[in-house]
Structure formats: structure tokens, C-alpha cells
Amino acid sequence: MAARCAVCGKGPQTGYTVSHSHIRNKRRFLPNLQPVRTTVDGQNVRLRVCTKCLKAGKVQRVKVA
């Protein structure tokens, strides 16, 4: 499953992990995705949304009984 936000499209970025001796190793920084139940076109669906979109209120959660 792709590490991509369903709302804003934020995906992984590349960079380095740097040790104390400054040896650099390539790595991927993944977005903090959370599964959220929301309503899309009148149907309850489960989306993977980044926490930045959740905090900004771009997604309304659905209460599941």
C-alpha cells in the first residue's frame, strides 16, 4: 500500500540518517498516516490521511456505532 495521504497527496521524501561520525546513509521519511473513517459521496469509507490534514480539519471523522 502506498504511503500517500488521500487528501493532500503527501508522500515519502528521501534524505539521510547521519551517525555521530557523520556517516550518511540514504533513508525514506514517511508521512504520519492514520486510518480514518469519513463520508465520501454519502458512503462511509476508510482513508489513510496524514496528521497535518486531520489537525487542519480537512477531514471530518464519522462516529461508528
UniProtKB/Swiss-Prot annotation:
One of its GO terms (biological process) is translation. GO terms for cellular component: ribonucleoprotein complex; ribosome. Keywords: Ribonucleoprotein, Ribosomal protein. Gene3D superfamilies: Ribosomal protein L28/L24 (2.30.170.40). InterPro entries: Bacterial_rp_bL28, Ribosomal_bL28, Ribosomal_bL28/bL31-like_sf, Ribosomal_bL28_bact-type, Ribosomal_bL28_sf. The keyword Ribonucleoprotein applies. One of its GO terms (molecular function) is structural constituent of ribosome. Transmembrane segments: none annotated. The keyword Ribosomal protein applies. Pfam families: Ribosomal_L28 (PF00830). It comes from the Bacteria. Belongs to the bacterial ribosomal protein bL28 family. This is Large ribosomal subunit protein bL28. It comes from Bifidobacterium animalis subsp. lactis (strain AD011).
